[in-house]
UniProtKB/Swiss-Prot annotation:
Keywords: 2Fe-2S, 4Fe-4S, Biotin biosynthesis, Iron, Iron-sulfur, Metal-binding, S-adenosyl-L-methionine, Transferase. Pathway: Cofactor biosynthesis; biotin biosynthesis; biotin from 7,8-diaminononanoate: step 2/2. Homodimer. Signal peptide: none annotated. [4Fe-4S] cluster binds at residues 17, 21, 24. Catalyzes the conversion of dethiobiotin (DTB) to biotin by the insertion of a sulfur atom into dethiobiotin via a radical-based mechanism. The keyword Endoplasmic reticulum does not apply. Its EC number is 2.8.1.6. This is Biotin synthase. Residues 1-228 form the Radical SAM core domain. [2Fe-2S] cluster binds at residues 61, 96, 154, 221. It is an enzyme of class 2 (transferase). Belongs to the radical SAM superfamily. Biotin synthase family.
Length: 282
């Protein structure tokens, strides 16, 4: 029976990002109707961690909006990591805080963070079409820094941004050179406040993307992330194929600014596919 790893997200700092990423509603350039706050209260984050662990989540990702880590964010994430680890929940803690240098990542590692998430998003060639305020190369360097710091690397991308199949191949080839332990696979969902005018991928094309990712990243944990709930909707037959084609992890619950599937119903559906929820990250 195939094991599926469940990971959950806490958006601990939301909105007001100065970057102009064309796919992200947290950018202040797009004026999306989202909640904006600086730092989520520690008690709320702990409640989320307990509740999601009880549902079976093994990974818990602390996400901050903004271009990069700074001293204030480092201290805040370190404080959250220590508090969560003191609960002895057995959660694998991931930080996702933008561009980061080696010293910052070593600081988070020593505070109890286990992995760092920083997505390449797309190919080096296509990236300037979706962001002008930082470079693809900066993203790649941060991924290298995470590995140098001894953290697990979680890095993936978004399919459906109007990129070509060659762009998809180039992104996956770059990811393969990093050997991430986990690769989130996101499917872009059109939003009227965002400048990208792209139709949602069909379930069949999304499955082709998963097959391609598996070909380039045979040893990575492929995680179905944003967009799964829209691309596959209630199409159980095609959603089940995700796991036949290489997906072995999913994001449980909500994303950064969009609703995911209801966790309990999502788990019931996964079980109906003949999948088993993993009991350990190792």
């Amino acid at each position: 029976m195939q094991e599926i790893f469940l990971c959950s997200i806490s958006n601990v700092r939301s909105g007001d990002c100065k970057e102009d990423c064309a796919y992200c509603t947290q950018s202040s350039h797009h004026q999306g109707a989202i909640k904006r706050y600086k730092f989520k209260d520690e008690k709320v984050v702990l409640q989320e961690a307990r509740a999601l662990r009880e549902l079976g989540a093994l990974g818990f990702c602390l996400v901050t909006s903004g271009r990069e880590l700074d001293d204030e964010k480092c201290e805040y994430i370190a404080k959250l990591a220590k508090a969560i680890n003191q609960e002895e929940l057995g959660l694998h803690l991931i930080a996702c805080c933008g561009r980061a240098d080696l010293d910052q990542l070593e600081f988070l590692r020593d505070a109890g963070i286990h992995s760092y998430n920083h997505n390449l998003e797309t190919s080096q060639n296509f990236f300037p079409k979706i962001c002008s305020t930082h470079t693809w190369e900066e993203r790649f360097i941060t991924c290298e820094n995470a590995l140098r710091a001894g953290l697990g690397l979680c890095s993936g991308g978004i399919f459906g941004l109007n990129e070509s199949w060659e762009d998809r191949i180039e992104m996956l080839r770059a990811l393969a050179s990093l050997s991430p332990h986990t690769t989130p696979i996101n499917f872009f969902i059109k939003n009227p406040v965002l400048p990208i005018d792209a139709e949602t991928l069909s379930a069949d094309e999304a499955l082709e993307c998963v097959l391609l990712a598996k070909e380039f990243l045979p040893n990575a944990r492929l995680m179905a992330a944003g967009g799964r709930e829209v691309v596959f909707k209630d199409n159980d037959k095609k959603e089940a194929k995700l796991f036949e084609y290489g997906i072995n992890a999913v994001v449980l619950g909500d994303y950064l600014t969009t609703k995911g599937k209801a966790p309990k119903k999502d788990i019931e559906r996964l079980l109906s596919y003949g999948l088993k929820m993993a009991a350990s990250c190792h």
